[in-house]
Amino acid sequence: MEEKKRYNLGVLIGGVHTYFPKEHIKGISEAAAELDVNVCFFLGTRTKDFFEDVLGSKQKNSYDYQFNTIHDYSLIGGLDGLIINYGTLGIQLREDDPNEFARKYNGITTVFLTEIVDVPNCHSLICDNKGGIAMVISHLVEEHHLSRILFVAGPEHNTDAIERKEAYLETMKKYGLPVTPGMIAQGDYSEFVDKQVERLLDSNPDAQAIVFANDEMAFAGYRVCEKRGLVVGKDIMITGFDDCERASGMEPPLTTVQQDGELMGKMAVYDLVNRLDGKDPGKEAVSRRVPVSFVKRESCGCVSEDASRKETPVGLGAQVHRLNKTIAGMKLELISFQRKSWFIPVLARDLNDCMDDEQAFLKEIMEKMRELHTR
């Protein structure tokens, strides 16, 4: 009897320091073990966004293309199937076109996560982003009678983020609530968007709620509000999206939208293996929406319906809150350390880039000196 071939699957994914990609990886790994297939991860990144966040300044040059050359190795790796989390990759393509990127891998059976592509032999899995945000806005308007609702968006070229922002605008319009450009801040899905939240609140002193495009950015909202003496869930309402592991342990617990990243990762592996086994021979592009659910907690002004929270021993909630603050503080300390330790090598890189132009070289030095607050 001929032994069944053990498939080799590749995974192109970035942003693995954030919650949702980690959930994808967990689901992919578990399904791969269950189905006895090999998995190779090709980890790309978005260095431009990272440098701007870590170094606290605008970066003129992007070196994403250097990091993302690893994606090309998946083409020569003898892979049977490929899972691509397009939204997390730092892709340097003309017009940032996912279909163009998909065609590059058209010879491999492929599943795209968090992106919809219309290319043969590619299936797409993406959550119901619009439905999730619509549920949040509707709840704030109908149950809490709020009208001044701000929004912190995710990366501008990320499909999940685009759909969530569109849903915010569409749902606010549905209720006849005006939205100005100053009511929307551009985030990056990281926890370190404190400055964006500060500016948003400065521009909107009458804000009643902030809807964040994911949970990690909402944590920054908690920090900023605490510094301003605003009590989340009373003075201002905050909501997120993802229902990550820290959401229920926040003080107050974070109202959010639950999407199952682990399930999405498993579904991608099941889909690939099913097609590789010949059980789904179709070559046409197929997209599926993964359902989400609204998780009502206390940060939106509701009283939690989580019975287990009512049974929480006295003092345990406070301990969890302190632990969350400690973790966030340690992350901020790490960011501060990275800013200091990376400044010199990045300075050397930028100066080297303009070495042939004396005026540009001197201008670069002056800009860096201003960043160091020296004259």
Mark where each language-model region is:
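Bacterial carbohydrate/catabolite-sensing allosteric modules
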Residues: 1-357, 363, 367-372
